[in-house]
Each structure stands twice: as C-alpha cells, then as structure tokens.
C-alpha cells in the first residue's frame, strides 16, 4: 500500500491493528481512559477495555507517528446536523515525498485516494464529495471493510473540522506544555457557525 510505504509506519500499524480493535460508536467507551496519551491508552487496553472509539485511536496513532518523526494531527470531522451527535476522528498525515497531507483512519482502517492513486486529504475528500468526483477507499493493511457504508459515513462527516492548533504528546491530558496553546482551529463552510 503506497501510503504506508510513504509513511514508513507499516510495522507500527500492523502491530497496532492486531492489538487494539475498534469500539463501534453506538457502544463507545464504557469507562473513558484517565490518561489519553500513548502510554495511558496502551495500558487502558491491557487493563480496562480492549477496544477504542475513533478519537482514542487517532490520539494513539498521532503520538506513535510523532515518535517516528512523522508529522500528523488528529482532526474531528463533523456533520452539518446539530442533532446528529455522531462525528468521526482521523489523522491527517504529512507526506513529505509528495508534499501533501493525507487522511489516515486507524479506527475504520482505511485511507482515501483519487483515480490516479494519490492519497487525499480531508479537504480534498470534501471537495470531491461536493463536486461529485470519485474517491477510492483502500483498506489499511489486510482489513476487510464495507466501503459502501464508509462512503455514506464520510458524506455526512466532511461538513466541518476541528483540530488543536498545537499538538503533541499528552495533548488531551492538560499537559502543562500546552497551557499557552489551547486554541483550536475550526474550519466551517461560509455562512455556517458550527455548534
């Protein structure tokens, strides 16, 4: 898979995928982790619950990729409907070899590309949905996915985005290193104020 070769993270992701399964949104976490950093989340899967929701998957992958020197951030992807409480959280990963961002979904174990095999960022995915252009979803490693459901899921969750302006280890744990960096970047369509 081209994106994994580009990321230099194949072994890391293979091990990650085998050890931490997906916790589906309707179930979500029975006990939310006390520590939302790579070490705390790993311990959580060994002692409390063996599975994660999408946010926790993205936080763990974010910190693992950073430890390998791979620039990335986790992004919350939201629907337009304020009554829809379901959102999705994925990683945006910088691919220096091709000088662009790409979406990597460790929770649903997939990534997106265009018809030429170029990995797509969240913004590019959103534009393609708006313009009716094809998005090809690829399974992460050897996972089996229902991409018909996944396409519909993304169609609703690409309306607006939220991400921390500054990210790093233990970002979600009120790490003192981030005390002066508590701003979020919120990208919304013109005329929409979010919720």
Question: What is each residue range found by the language model?
Answer:
Residues 128-195:
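Low-complexity, Gly/Ser/Thr/Pro-rich intrinsically disordered linker/tail segments
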Residues 1-52:
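Secondary-structure boundary elements
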Residues 50-54, 75-77:
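Short His-Asn-centered micro-motif
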Residues 59-133:
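Hydrophobic/aromatic-rich core segments of domains that either
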Residues 1-5, 11, 62, 87, ...:
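Bimodal feature
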Residues 10, 52-59, 63:
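A structural signal for well-ordered alpha-helical segments within the folded catalytic domains
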């Amino acid at each position: 898979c081209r994106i994994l070769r580009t990321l230099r993270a194949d072994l890391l992701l293979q091990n990650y995928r085998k050890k931490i399964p997906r916790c589906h949104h309707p179930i979500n976490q029975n006990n939310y982790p006390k520590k939302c950093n790579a070490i705390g989340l790993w311990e959580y899967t060994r002692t409390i619950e063996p599975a994660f929701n999408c946010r926790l998957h993205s936080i763990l992958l974010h910190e693992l990729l950073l430890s390998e020197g791979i620039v990335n951030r986790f992004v919350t992807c939201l629907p337009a409907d304020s009554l829809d409480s379901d959102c999705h959280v994925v990683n945006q990963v910088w691919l220096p070899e091709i000088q662009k961002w790409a979406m990597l979904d460790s929770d649903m174990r997939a990534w997106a590309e265009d018809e030429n095999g170029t990995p797509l960022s969240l913004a590019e995915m959103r534009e393609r949905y708006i313009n009716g252009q094809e998005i090809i979803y690829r399974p992460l490693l050897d996972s089996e996915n229902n991409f018909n459901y996944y396409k519909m899921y993304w169609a609703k969750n690409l309306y607006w985005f939220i991400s921390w302006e500054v990210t790093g280890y233990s970002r979600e744990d009120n790490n003192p290193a981030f005390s002066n960096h508590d701003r979020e970047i919120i990208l919304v369509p013109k005329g929409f104020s979010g919720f």
